[in-house]
């Protein structure tokens, strides 16, 4: 056997061995394509598609810390020291398109903490904390069901951009409800709502009494039977501003209340608003007309002084003679982080002194600084 024959034989053996190994080899499957989270811009900034679905999700909220001093401008009592409170609000929003319209949900969970020095001796304070499901509703097109704020409060718009905005309360806040909002293409909108009644998430806490004049603890503003509270409203909005009105029927006390509000954009930086209200019950111990007496009026302005700083002013007065004035400057230190120093003044009338059970009340000055990070 010569060298040439030996080399040819060795090569043939190697080819045969390689073929046998290839026949025994396991073929690995191709890796699946990675599905990255997609941005969803159909419902605003911050939404993304939940993988494997056409539902868009947004996680947002805020963290805030408040420091208060001076008098409590709601009750008129002297704080005797600093009051501190903190809140973490976690919000989750979803949205998707269906054959019946846009399907949305919104939830907000609040974690609260507060520490107070408001004892008469000013020496010992009190602490409290708690967690609450503030909002949880489903919306399909214009139909909304769940826990939300009353249309009597939101349809006309909130009061001014101040922290102590409801020293003279303009109505209840959180409630269970079924509502329908019609939005036209020409700036007009209308709403009708059936509501369970509020839980007094506002500024004034009423004192309910039985037929013998004894105080009833733990009662809120909820309905006491099958008949719901009813709210209806109309609004027109344009580039110049808006005008809106609402009327509400309180099924518990069988009385009604109404509000009308106008907003005007003087310039891109300067806007003003005015709101008037009337209640047939003439008492704050109710779900909607929580001001004193028959009527109340609120007004305010906002001036965007710079890109970072805004000045806000609000004044209010009711039929019982209470006057409340608040002013602040909201300064955005960096995007998403705002510091707001605010000062408030309240003048109490004789009727409010009797309502609050404190004949020594006269006026109250209070201040607050809010630190808030929104995301």
Curated annotation (Swiss-Prot):
GO cellular component: cell outer membrane; pore complex
Outcome recorded upon mutating residue 80 to N: In strain: Fr11 and Wf21
Effect of residue 339 to V: In strain: 686, De12, Fr7, Fr11, Pt1, Thomsen and Wf21
Keyword terms of this UniProt record: Cell outer membrane, Ion transport, Membrane, Porin, Signal, Transmembrane, Transmembrane beta strand, Transport
Effect recorded for residue 85 to G: In strain: De12, Fr7, Pt1 and Thomsen
Protein localization: Cell outer membrane
Main localisation: membrane
Miscellaneous comment as given in the Swiss-Prot or TrEMBL entry: The pore formed by Omp2a is larger than the one formed by Omp2b. Omp2b pores have optimal permeability to allow growth and protection against harmful compounds. The larger pore formed by Omp2a may be advantageous for intracellular growth, when the bacterium is competing with the host cell for nutrients whose concentration is particularly low within the phagosome.
Protein name: Porin Omp2b
Native species: Brucella suis
């Amino acid at each position: 056997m010569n060298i040439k024959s030996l080399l040819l034989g060795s090569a043939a053996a190697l080819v045969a061995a390689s073929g046998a190994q290839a026949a025994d080899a396991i073929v690995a499957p191709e890796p699946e394509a990675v599905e990255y989270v997609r941005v969803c811009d159909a419902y605003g900034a911050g939404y993304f598609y939940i993988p494997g679905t056409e539902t868009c999700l947004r996680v947002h909220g805020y963290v805030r810390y408040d420091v208060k001093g001076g008098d409590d401008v709601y009750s008129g009592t002297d704080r005797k020291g600093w009051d501190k409170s903190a809140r973490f609000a976690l919000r989750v929003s979803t949205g998707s398109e269906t054959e019946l319209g846009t399907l949305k949900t919104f939830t907000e969970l609040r974690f609260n903490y507060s520490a107070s020095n408001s004892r008469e001796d000013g020496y010992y304070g009190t602490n409290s904390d708690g967690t609450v499901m503030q909002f949880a509703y489903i919306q399909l097109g214009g139909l909304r069901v769940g826990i939300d704020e009353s249309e009597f409060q939101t349809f006309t718009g909130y009061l001014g951009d101040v922290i102590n905005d409801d020293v003279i309360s303009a109505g209840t806040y959180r409630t269970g409800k079924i509502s329908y909002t019609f939005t036209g293409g020409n700036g007009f909108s209308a709403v009708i709502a059936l509501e369970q009644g509020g839980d007094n998430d506002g500024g004034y806490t009423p004192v309910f009494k039985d037929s013998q004049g004894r105080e009833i603890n733990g009662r809120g503003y909820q309905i006491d039977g099958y008949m719901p509270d009813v709210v209806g409203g109309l609004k027109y909005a344009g580039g110049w501003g808006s005008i809106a009105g609402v009327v509400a029927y309180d099924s518990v006390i069988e009385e009604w209340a109404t509000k009308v509000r106008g907003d005007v954009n003087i310039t891109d930086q300067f806007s003003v608003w005015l709101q008037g209200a009337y209640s047939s019950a003439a008492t704050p111990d109710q779900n909607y007309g929580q001001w004193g007496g028959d009527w109340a009026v609120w007004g305010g302005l906002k001036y965007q002084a710079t890109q970072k700083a805004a000045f806000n002013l609000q004044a209010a007065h009711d039929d019982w003679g209470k006057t409340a004035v608040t002013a602040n400057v909201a300064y955005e230190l960096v995007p998403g982080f705002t510091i707001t120093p605010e000062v408030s003044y309240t003048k109490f009338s004789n009727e409010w002194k009797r309502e609050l059970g404190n004949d020594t009340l006269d006026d109250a000055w209070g201040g607050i600084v809010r630190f808030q990070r929104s995301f």
